[in-house]
Amino acid sequence: MLKYLPAYLATIIFMFIVDLIWLSQIAQPLYQDGIGHLMAATPKLAFAAIFYLVFVLGLMWFAVRPNAQIKSVKSTFVAGALFGFFVYASYDLTNLALLKDWPLKLSIIDMTWGTLLSGTCALVAKLVFTKTNKT
């Protein structure tokens, strides 16, 4: 499993940077308008770090590893996108079901973002894995 480590680490860095740009520059007003009353003044970075470590581990296991030996990147992207959709949908649909006034629009945007980000991260992981494991 160590052969996946460079891809895992590169994907964590890539996802963190892209998600940081998304959250701080693009989606922040959406979150502020929709759930600003729930947002902490300062994010709890330790929990964010744990999320990225765990999420990318799941992405590697369910999307990259099964497609590692397949030359086509399409199956890796689709598997990653589906993984992201299922994870983000679990979060967003649970919030819609349980939290008062959780905005549907925010959930749709968040699930779309999670799907696209995860598919792209799976591609990054596959590319790094392929480059670092040439035979």
What are these regions (language model features)?
Residues M1-W113, L117-T135:
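Juxtamembrane/disordered regions of integral membrane proteins
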